[in-house]
Structure formats: C-alpha cells, structure tokens
A protein has these predicted regions:
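Flexible glycine-rich active-site/ligand-binding loops centered on an Asp-His dyad
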Residues: 103-127
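A generic local structural motif
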Residues: 7-11, 36-37, 58-60
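Short beta-strand segments
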Residues: 19-54
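Short, structured beta-strand-loop surface elements
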Residues: 55-110
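Short, basic/aromatic recognition patches
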Residues: 1-23
C-alpha cells in the first residue's frame, strides 16, 4: 500500500542504495506514457528523488514534467544469491525541472517498496 512517509528501512536503503538505474515515467499531452531509464539520487534535505542524465532540461521527460507537474520513478533489481528475489522502490509525486542543476526532482507524495531488506544493512535485523 502506498504511503506518503518514508519508512525507517527505506531511509536506510536511500542512505546507501545499491547501484541500479531508475525508470522515470511521465505522460505526454495525448496521455501516452513515456518511460526512460537514467541515473538517480536522493536529496535528504528536501526528501526528493533527483533524476539526472544527459541534457535533462531539453528531454521529452522534462517537457512532460513542465506540462503536467507530475511523474513516477521506479528503482528496482534482484537481490544477490540464488532464486528470484526482486526488490523495488516506487515513488509518485509532484515533479519539477531544476534547470540550474539539469535534473528532475520528484517530491514523495506516494511511496511503495518491497524486498529492500535483502539489499540493505537492515536485512541482518530481519526487516
């Protein structure tokens, strides 16, 4: 279930995340989804997902964010070891283009995650 607040496990995961691509989803003027992989980080001061890449302010995703003011992002992967152990961190929220830094910032209006304990220090604590 989606929440608006980060859990303690999510905060630990964001403080030391595994190397993984993010996928940012936006919607164009016709309502057609647009999904693009890219680099990411988390700004703990503003509690925003920060999505970078090459010349971001001139991209289609930036155009969509400027028009709609919203976006979603997924960071996901598979836990190390045998078997199928997926993990994911999903955010939906208000988005804006930061032209000065050349990134897109997404506020956490809704957050959902699963399997993060398998790829964080909290895994040893049984979280």
């Amino acid at each position: 279930m989606a929440r608006s607040e980060l859990s303690a496990l999510e905060r630990r995961w964001l403080a030391d995340p595994p190397q993984a691509l993010a996928r940012i989803a936006t919607v164009d003027a016709d309502g057609m989804p647009h999904v693009v992989p890219g680099g990411w980080s988390f700004d703990p001061a503003t509690e925003e997902m920060v999505l970078g890449g090459r010349d971001v302010p001139r991209t289609q995703r930036a155009l969509h964010v400027r028009a709609s003011g919203h976006a979603a992002v997924v960071v996901d992967g598979l836990a190390p070891g045998p078997g199928w152990s997926p993990w994911a961190f999903v955010v939906r929220g208000r988005a804006r283009v930061d032209d000065d830094l050349g990134v897109i910032r997404i506020a956490i209006d809704q957050v959902t995650s699963w399997g993060l304990g398998s790829v964080t220090a909290g895994a040893a604590a049984g979280e």
